[in-house]
Amino acid sequence: MPSVDDLDHYIAAAARAVDQWVDGHIPATRDVVPIGFSQGGAVAVHLLRMHPERYRAVINLSGFLAPAGVPGTAPADDRLTDFEIPVYFGYGKNDAVIPKYELFAAAAWLEEHTWLTTKSYRGLDHAVSLDEFSDIRQWLVLHDIASGVL
């Protein structure tokens, strides 16, 4: 497991790379909803912590949060609540990869900083399920994020 500082740097660097790609390839008028699983979930949430005005919502599946103890790695944390960005956070109750305290800490932080919907799935390990995808579909429709695709 990387040190706390290393984790901050790694997640922030990955989020910066995704954010730069989005900036260079997706028109600013298009809604962007990052979705990530595990470390990808941490990166998806971190995009909000860096550039919340660019992202319409986030879906974090069995992810965690970078601690943001290194100055400058999460520059928008202090203003994130102003945006009320919808976040879906789902995880398996039997996840043996991400410690429960990390999942609960992520849920608590997201509850405080975003418009959070969280759901845990009985019997699900560090994985995703059809039930979870069904719930995400409903959540996208509820928040008018479907754009006619669903």
Go through the PLM ranges and name each one.
Residues 83, 88-91, 95:
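Short beta-strand/loop motif that positions the catalytic acidic residue
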Residues 66-86:
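Conserved serine/cysteine hydrolase catalytic core
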Residues 1-31:
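Serine-hydrolase catalytic machinery in alpha/beta-hydrolase-like enzymes
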Residues 53-68:
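A conserved short beta-strand
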Residues 101-150:
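C-terminal catalytic histidine-bearing segment of alpha/beta-hydrolase fold enzymes
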Residues 35-40, 44:
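Gly/Ala-rich beta-loop-alpha elbow adjacent to hydrolase catalytic centers
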Residues 46-50:
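Active-site signature of alpha/beta-hydrolase-fold catalytic machinery across serine-
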Residues 67, 93-98, 125-127:
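Acidic catalytic loop of the alpha/beta-hydrolase fold
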